[in-house]
Swiss-Prot record:
Interacts with histones H3 and H4. It comes from the Eukaryota. SUPFAM superfamilies: PH domain-like (SSF50729). It holds the Pfam family Rttp106-like_middle. Residues 54-73, 364-469 are annotated as: Disordered. Residues 364-379, 402-415 have a biased composition (Basic and acidic residues). Histones H3 and H4 chaperone involved in the nucleosome formation and heterochromatin silencing. Required for the deposition of H3K56ac-carrying H3-H4 complex onto newly-replicated DNA. Plays a role in the transcriptional regulation of the cell-cycle dependent histone genes by creating a repressive structure at the core histone gene promoter. Residues 416-433, 440-469 have a biased composition (Acidic residues). This is Histone chaperone rtt-106.
Amino acid sequence: MAAKLDSQLLGLVFQSRPDILKGIQEAADSPARIDLFNNIASFVYERIADNTSEEPATKRRRVEAQTSGPNGAAHPIAGSQAAVLGADAAAAEPVLLEIKDISVSVPQRKKYDLCFTKNFLYARASGSPVPVQGIVYPWKDIEHAFYLPVPDKSQVQHNYVLLPRNSYLPTTKSQQSADQQTQQQTSAPLEPLVFTIPSTAPKPGTITGPSAAAAAPVSDSYATLFHWALTTSLHAAGNHACELVSSDPKVFHSVARQAYRPQEKAVHVKAFRGSKDGFLFFLPTGILWGFKKPLLFLPLDKIVAISYTSVLQRTFNIVVELEGGGEGSEEGGQEIEFSMLDQEDYAGIDQSYVRRHGLADRSMAEQRKAKKQLAENAKKAAANGEEGEGGEGGEAGDGLTELERAQKEEEQRLQDEEDEEEEDYDPGSEGESEGSGSSSEEEEEEEDGEGEGDEDDDEDMGEGLEGEE
C-alpha cells in the first residue's frame, strides 16, 4: 500500500503556516519523504501537547485564552484537548456543502468558509483544509436557531444566530464554579455562532461540494440557501427539536422609526445590559439580547415574571426574573435587568408581548413549564412511534391529539382549583358586617320559634274552652 501524507495531522500542526504545509505537499514525492514528514508532524504535535500540560497554570491560562491563528487572527485555541478532538472529528468527515466568504461576528469577527458535514457545521479559513478550533458545532448540540434583521444598517442584512447547549443563559457564581469543575472532566461549552448574510444572491463559485447541485434551486438568495441548508442538516442529524425561528412584526414591533430604513417596522428595541449597548428581540420562543458577547437568550418557559423599574418620562428599565436551579436547588432565581428602553415602546412591550404571554403574572410560570413538558413528551412519543389510546397519532375516541388532550386536562385542572377556592370561601371572614348579618338570621329563627309557641298556646286555649262548654 502506497504511503500517504497525514493531511489531518499536518494541518493541525501547521495551521498558522499554510506556506510550510504547501511546501511539504510539494516535496512529498517519495515514500521515504512521506514517512519523514508524517513522523515530524507526529513529534511536533506530541511536543505541543506535552508543553501545554507542563506549563505553569498562570501561563497556560494566558496562552489558552488567545493565540494567533491564520493571517494573524486571534482566536481561542485548542489548549483544550477536547477542542482538538472536535476539530479532528469534523475534519475527518467529507464536506457535503461549502459556502464561501461568510462574515462571522461571534465567536470571532472574520470572513470564513462555512462547511456542512453529516454531523458538524464548522468554519475554516480560505485555502485551509482544517476547521478553526472553537468554531466547530455538532448538529445535535444546537438548541436554538434564529434569523434576525441587523439593526442600524442602510443595506438590508440578516444575522443567523445558532445557540448550542449551555451557551445562552447567564450563570451565577455558584454555577460558574460548578461549571469549571465539570469542564475539567468534559469539554468546555461552545460559544454561540453569529454570521451575517446580505440580501443579494450568492456569487458564482461561492457554493461548492457534493450537495451544491441540490442547493441550486434554493440559491436565489443567501436566506433561502441557508434556511434550506440549516434545516436539512439539523433534521438529517436527528435534531428535530431545534427549529429556525424568525422575528415577526405580528408578535412584536417597535413604534420608533428606524433611522436607516424608516419604511420598515423594527422588530427590536435598543437596550443596555450594564454598560454594554445592544438590541432586544421579542421572539415567539423567548427574548434575545445581541449581538455583542455574551449573547443572552431567555426562553419563555424559563421566565417567571417580567417587571418594570425606573419608569421615567423618556426611558424605562425591564427586569426579567428567571426560574431557579431546578428541583432540589437551594439557589433562587436570577433577575436580569435591561435599561434605557425607549418610553415609546412601553405599551407595545407590555400589551403585545408581556401580557399576551402571561409574563406579568408569576402564577403563570408553572403553566408555561407544564405546556413545554407536554409538548416535549408529545414530540418524544412521536419520535418513538408510540400510539395513544384509540389509534394512530395519539388520538383517542375524542379525536384529540395527545398534546391537545393534555392541554385540555391542564385547563380543567385550573378550573377545578378555582371551583375549590369558591367552595372554601367563608363569608364570615369578610368583616363585622357579615357577623351582624348572622346575628339577624339567628334573631329571625328565634322569632319564628316564638311564633310557633304562640300558635300552640292558642290551640290549647281553644281546647280548654270546648271542654268548659
